[in-house]
Design a protein with these regions (language model features):
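Conserved alpha/beta-domain cores
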Residues: 115-117, 122-140, 145-208
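N-terminal intrinsically disordered, cationic/polar leader segments
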Residues: 1-113
Length: 208
């Protein structure tokens, strides 16, 4: 927790009854009281304890000692919850600067692309839409492109970077090549740490 600075609540993720496979995580920094988690949603009675445990673990990893964390869950998978929490903490500036909440990486999400592999079909997936990510491999594309450029609003690029990193590490991409399209340079440089070293096999640079 940063001292000598006004603490501001922040959130990441969509709200509303129509939200599916996503969540809104709100972080309200406090000066004492440790981390208190509240889970709301239709499946809170089933998964509330697991979500609470994940949020508590995430706050510890991110350096958040005292905060109220409110999760409005719409059926989000663990990688989505991790991404929304980290993005909210970064926005609130209440944890350890540049800390990451990294879930274990799937064993298959390692290694470079095979030389000479076909790239006939590529599926673009918006970097801020986890509801499209989990089943992307079912379409059996040669490559999946997690897009951080055109499909992401400027105000949501910070959260999308974290989401893409968490998805690269956690999801089963089948035989698809894992690609990330970054923003135009020099701004796209900020995208690279969230893709390189986390399972991306190819970085796509927009036309300049």
């Amino acid at each position: 927790m940063k001292h000598g600075k006004t603490m501001t609540a922040a959130e990441a993720g969509p709200r509303g009854e129509k939200v599916r496979s996503d969540a809104c995580v709100r972080v309200e920094p406090e000066t004492s009281g440790k981390v208190v988690v509240t889970v709301r949603g239709k499946v809170a009675s089933l998964y509330g304890d697991a979500i609470t445990a994940q949020m508590t673990e995430g706050c510890a990893a991110l350096g958040v000692e005292h905060a109220r964390v409110i999760v409005d869950d719409g059926g989000a998978l663990p990688f989505v919850l991790a991404a929304r929490l980290e993005a909210a903490v970064r926005r609130a500036e209440c944890g350890t600067p540049n800390a990451e909440f990294l879930l274990a990486r799937r064993p298959g999400n390692r290694g470079p692309s095979e030389k000479g592999r076909h790239r006939r079909t590529r599926l673009y997936v918006p970097g801020g839409r986890p509801n499209f990510m989990a089943n992307a491999h079912l379409h059996a594309p040669d490559g999946v492109i997690l897009d951080l450029e055109d499909s992401v609003a400027p105000a949501e690029k910070d959260a999308a970077r974290v989401m893409v990193r968490c998805a690269l590490r956690s999801l089963d991409w089948g035989d698809a090549e894992r690609m990330v399209r970054i923003n135009p340079l020099p701004g796209g440089i900020r995208d690279l740490p969230f893709a390189v070293g986390h399972g991306a096999q190819m970085i796509l640079i927009p036309k300049v």
